[in-house]
Every structure is written in structure tokens, then in C-alpha cells.
């Protein structure tokens, strides 16, 4: 949410800057691994792989739900025009590409429009966060597991 606010305030969001997303891509696995280590510490230094997986997936799903709620508040209350502005910027950038035909641009815009639907993007976000939470917790669980 912090990254989203910063990119919105600075105008980076409409420019399509991707580097702020790398902050999230770095922070998410760190948070998952930290949560697993804290769970292990609270559990007398015992951790099974299934416990690690539960923690990781739960962190992923909760983070996606929080981001989804923020996105809905942002897109419906704070700046209802933002998504249409983003779509316009995306269309303009695609039209600047000499290799893209009008048909390709229209097809891409249909795809972007589909994912601008809060229900579809929210479901996708929850699923992807759960999958990445599972992957990171599998790695962390294999490293940190210690059973009785």
C-alpha cells in the first residue's frame, strides 16, 4: 500500500514505472520468511513443513485481501478516474510501438479491461499471492524445519 501511495503521489503510476514493484517483490518473501521464523520461535523452536506452508499461504492471502480492499477504496473513493487514465496511458504506449497493429492494441486493451474488474483482479491477486506464499514458505520451511 505504501508503495502504491508513493507511486500515485509522484506520478510514477501513470508513467508505468515498474521499479517500485521490485520493492514489493523483495519485501514479500522477506516478510513470509520472517513470519515463519517467528512462528518457529513461538513454537519452542519446532516447525514442521506443513506449519511453514500454512503460515506462508496465510500471509499471502491476507496481504492480497488487504491490497484488494485498499485498491477498491482507492479506485472507487479516492480516484475513480485513475483506472481509465491508466488504460488511456497504456493504449497510448502501445500505439507508439510500430510493431503493434490496431488489432493487437484492441486485443490487449480487452485483456487490460478484464483485469481492471475488481472481482477478477482480486481473485487473481489472491490466487497469485497464495501461490507465491506457498513457494516462499516451501523454501523457508525446508530450510527452517525442525521437528521433535
Each language-model region and where it sits:
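Transmembrane alpha-helical insertion/packing segments
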Residues: 1-38
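Alpha-helical transmembrane segments of multipass membrane proteins
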Residues: 3, 7, 28-32, 63-67, ...
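Short helix-capping/hinge motifs at transmembrane helix termini and TM-loop junctions
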Residues: 11-12, 71, 75-79, 144-148
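Cytoplasmic-side transmembrane-helix entry/capping segments in multi-pass membrane proteins
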Residues: 23, 48-55
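Membrane-helix interface/capping segments
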Residues: 37-51
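Hydrophobic alpha-helical membrane-insertion segments
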Residues: 59-81
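Membrane-interface interhelical loops and short interface/amphipathic helices
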Residues: 78-115
